[in-house]
Amino acid sequence: MDKKVIIIIVITLFFVLKKIRKIIGPLLLVLVFLFLFNNIKNIKSFFQTPKNEESTYSFLTLKNSDINTKENLKNKKIGYIESFMPVEIDEYVLKSYDANNIYNVLLKKEVDAIYISDSYLSVLKEEYKDILEQTKIVEEEKVENVILATESKNRDIINIFISGTDSKKEKITSKSRSDVNIILTVNTKKNKVLITSIPRDYYVELFSNKKDKLTHCGVYGITVCTETLNKLLDIEINYFLKINMNAFTKVIDLLNGITLKDGTKLTSEEALKYVRERYSYKEGDRKRVENNQDILEEIIKSFIRNKSLLLNYKDILESLNGYYMTNIDENLIVEVIKNLLLGKSLKIERQILNGFDSYDTTYSIPNKKLYVMLPDDKSLETAREKLKNMLP
């Protein structure tokens, strides 16, 4: 049967024969599964997207060093950031350092070179404006980091970490700052969704009890982000979805724009400005986080209202290729699509973690006090309680 014919039949059943849904229920179920079965290859295309992060690691030496090739590094002393040595390098003398010392030990010539990722080099550029003039890259290596999904202890509850990068140029597989941080908690049994947003500047505990902004977690990888949020919220994140600005604007274009609760219609570029702007608001990033939730909720509702979007998901996924990465299980996607096609209602709730404005040093940029948001214990406890209430 032609795909378009199936789409017409299913939409007709939904919108013309609503009053006799009980009678056609079994037939509708068959048609839904027919559609999913006939298009299972299209679903699988979603899961052929990147699931692993890639990093470029560089051997960095001082500009006036006589080390110019990787061969020159043999038997030399190499510094690396503690807990972040992605490969075994036997031919070098290795020594680990905290992130706050890694560049200083090179400047003081305590090591001959340092081994760091491109994502952390971008952070160092903020603190040391002349780092590229003072150093040179001897060798670069591509390293792939596997990101495993965590099986839920309760199959009815799924926690998905959504990470949004503030870039259109970076490869989606590159480690980068996480400017949008959302936990999407889905109760598949009750058809409930809880959107939990955490501000980018939230002052959180990373590995080894080090404090940093949440946005900097992304520099060290998605796994560090999820582990940090698991600890903060006392939850278990099962999957991740990482998107960039291209993915965002393309989804809005596919929806022919987005309409806010107050009736304001936004184009994709206007919506992008709406979710990025924070300096013009008195509430700053708090307002930006709220705007992010507005758009995400409307996107979810748009898919629920317009079943044809679900039926044409192949085109949607193909148009987003290269702009997102995920390790979401295909069975979960099939379950969600099936429930929405069968007309099951979805209750959406939302919450935003709050805190207090402050300035403090961070693990990533230790020699300079940056703006951070100190967690409000009451807000944190309320958020944890809401997440627990999502359990069956």
Predicted region positions:
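Membrane-embedded alpha-helical segments of integral membrane proteins
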Residues: 1-18
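Hydrophobic membrane-insertion alpha-helices, especially the h-region
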Residues: 24-37
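Hydrophobic alpha-helical transmembrane segments in integral membrane proteins
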Residues: 36-49
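Non-catalytic, solvent-exposed segments at the cell envelope interface
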Residues: 47-52, 60-64, 70, 74-392
